[in-house]
Design a protein with these regions (language model features):
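Single conserved hydrophobic/aromatic residue that forms the stacking wall/gate
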Residues: 2-13
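Short, solvent-exposed loop/helix junctions and linker helices
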Residues: 6, 88-91, 95, 212-215
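Histidine-centered active-site microenvironments of extracellular/periplasmic hydrolases
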Residues: 30-93
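Polar, surface-exposed loop/tail segments
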Residues: 38-40, 85-145, 229
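Generic recognition of well-ordered alpha-helical segments
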Residues: 71, 96, 100-104, 117, ...
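WW-domain-binding short linear motifs
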Residues: 129-133, 255-262
Length: 272
């Protein structure tokens, strides 16, 4: 903490926020200048949050997925409803953005998309989901209903995980030769439209694997919005674990992921 604080990371972050604020202001000014509000949808969103010493962390990665990381800003202007200055209680995710844009332009939403169009939510707060699943590949996984959040730790670190892909590239590099030597062909998933995929042994960064230090974490966001106290409530934990299993099935998660997180598949998978 002292390392980052002494280097003024907080000040750098503030300057970046001011810069983004100015650039967003330019967009809003242009919307005014060209009178675009009457027929243009505007979406402002971020991909993830950033720790500035909260919970003892800086940046992101290697920490539990607290609200500071996963509860991101989302502002949407929809000229059809014309609602403004309203904070909606609806639980939504970034996967809802693409269906929302498609629906705005009257384009059919593909059956493979799990996101929901937010058209009615933007009009009158109609909910689109009961739960939201979130996390990083092979690391602790979270689920929330908007009030209670459960962070599920990895239960079987010996269970291998795989990357399923038709394009073997990481974010900043191609897959290595060593990784490609583990590749086999798999039949694919419900969303690959009947096409096979490469199944490549994943090699997660070990510093990300033990973020919960061996235990699940349940929080009541209504009474503990800063997630300072782990809640002991078996009923809520069981309910959220059931919802997590259902979300795994909806996402057509591979079988090894159930073992990794100590979940029992009911066999209700999406049709391929």
């Amino acid at each position: 903490r002292d390392y980052y604080a002494s280097r003024g990371l907080g000040d750098v972050y503030k300057r970046q926020v001011r810069f983004c604020d100015r650039q967003l202001g330019r967009v809003l000014d242009l919307m005014d200048e060209l009178d675009l509000w009457k027929d243009t949808m505007l979406i402002v969103n971020t991909d993830h949050g950033f720790f500035l010493s909260e919970h003892g962390y800086w940046g992101k990665g290697g920490s539990p997925n607290y609200e500071e990381l996963v509860h991101t800003p989302l502002f949407i202007w929809d000229p059809r409803s014309g609602r403004k200055g309203v904070h909606s209680p609806a639980l939504v995710q970034t996967i809802d953005l693409a269906p929302t844009v498609l629906d705005y332009f009257g384009i059919e939403i593909p059956a493979d998309m799990l996101g929901r169009p937010l058209t009615q939510t933007l009009a009158d707060d109609t909910p689109v989901r009961e739960y939201a699943l979130f996390g990083y590949h092979s690391m602790p996984v979270g689920i929330t209903d908007g009030r209670y959040t459960l962070l599920r730790d990895v239960k079987d670190f010996d269970e291998k995980t795989y990357e399923y892909t038709q394009m073997p590239t990481h974010m900043r590099a191609m897959f290595s030769v060593e990784e490609m030597r583990t590749a086999t062909m798999a039949p694919g998933f419900s969303y690959t439209k009947g096409t096979p995929v490469m199944k490549i042994e994943a090699r997660p960064n070990p510093r990300f694997l033990h973020t919960l230090k061996g235990g699940d974490m349940l929080f009541d966001l209504q009474n503990d919005p800063h997630q300072e106290h782990v809640l002991e409530d078996a009923e809520q934990s069981d309910r959220l674990l059931t919802a997590m299993t259902a979300a795994f099935e909806e996402n057509d998660a591979p079988e090894e992921m159930y073992s990794r997180y100590g979940l029992s598949s009911t066999g209700r998978r999406r049709n391929k």
